[in-house]
Swiss-Prot record:
Keywords: ATP-binding, Ligase, Nucleotide-binding, Protein biosynthesis. Allows the formation of correctly charged Asn-tRNA(Asn) or Gln-tRNA(Gln) through the transamidation of misacylated Asp-tRNA(Asn) or Glu-tRNA(Gln) in organisms which lack either or both of asparaginyl-tRNA or glutaminyl-tRNA synthetases. The reaction takes place in the presence of glutamine and ATP through an activated phospho-Asp-tRNA(Asn) or phospho-Glu-tRNA(Gln). The keyword Transferase does not apply. SUPFAM superfamilies: Glu-tRNAGln amidotransferase C subunit. GO terms for molecular function: asparaginyl-tRNA synthase (glutamine-hydrolyzing) activity; ATP binding; glutaminyl-tRNA synthase (glutamine-hydrolyzing) activity. This is Aspartyl/glutamyl-tRNA(Asn/Gln) amidotransferase subunit C. PANTHER family: GLUTAMYL-TRNA(GLN) AMIDOTRANSFERASE SUBUNIT C, MITOCHONDRIAL. It comes from the Bacteria. Its EC number is 6.3.5.-. The keyword Ligase applies. It comes from Chlorobium phaeovibrioides (strain DSM 265 / 1930) (Prosthecochloris vibrioformis (strain DSM 265)).
Length: 95
């Protein structure tokens, strides 16, 4: 299958696009290059090859979660430059 300049012009009209003659010719060449590549991929023998979603065998490479004791409220507030009651005080950001 190949794309002609008439095909590109027709598709451009459907998409409400405007191409100059040079742009349409370039688009024709680029689309034909893509289609040639797809034809090359279609020639590859994939008989007996299982479909893959990932080329790696690794499933989950993240570390395991480890439970830790939470920091006490008083300890957290002791590191804050300013606090009020049980809360951090920060400068007002919005007007």
């Amino acid at each position: 299958m190949s794309v002609t300049i008439d095909d590109v012009t027709y598709i451009a009209e459907l998409a409400r696009l405007r191409f100059s003659d040079d742009e349409a010719l370039k688009m024709t060449d680029e689309l034909n290059t893509i289609l040639h590549y797809v034809d090359t991929l279609n020639e590859v023998d994939t008989e007996g090859v299982l479909p893959l979603s990932n080329i790696h065998d690794q499933k989950n490479v993240l570390r395991a979660d480890e439970e830790h004791e939470p920091i006490a409220n008083a300890a957290a507030l002791s590191n804050a430059p300013d606090s009020q009651d049980r809360f951090f005080r920060v400068p007002k950001v919005l007007g």
